[in-house]
Amino acid sequence: GHAVWCARRLIGNEPFAVILPDDVIAAEKPCLQQMVEAYEETGGNMVAAMEVPAAKASSYGVLDINEDMGSMVSVNGMVEKPEPGTEPSNLAVIGRYILSPHVLKNLNKIKSGAGGEIQLTDAIAQEIGTERGVYGYRFRGQRFDCGSKSGFLQATVAFGLSRDDLRDDLHAYLTDLMATEKAAQ
């Protein structure tokens, strides 16, 4: 929340996007572009969302869904890292947001939350029930958690294999590597 608050003069009274860099998304149409189109439909605050297995829901912020409209859901609430078995849905919040300038006003009023920091999610949650509301958007694409070493490596391989100029060499290398690994077992 503090980083967004520091940008308030640049943002002014306009809707704005927040991109968390550890969430990398591969998509034919960029995730943020998909969300802008959805935002233009609703005018409401928008968070990217993806379905996760129940066993992994406790690792995410999870949406409490009011109404499911297909690619979008209206939100009753957000539960940060719910205890297993208590998650209100399997729809997890991912690091892409399009927010109204009202969120900045909410940030101005918020006291420090988790970890002694001003939490952006608290400011977004204050928009639930307003005329703007909060929506989850089920983006089309594949998300990689580059906040973990494994996720970073998965993204690197996936993006490498998606490129015409890298695919053949990378595929040959990975095939050889796996054959060597299997032979060593």
List PLM regions with ranges.
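Conserved beta-loop-beta/alpha segment of the NTase-like Rossmann-fold superfamily
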Residues: 1-65, 99-101, 107-110
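Intrinsic disorder at enzyme termini
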Residues: 170-185
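Catalytic-core segments of class I nucleotidyltransferases/pyrophosphorylases
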Residues: 17, 36-40, 69-172
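Alpha-helix boundary/capping detector
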Residues: 26, 33, 129, 153-154, ...
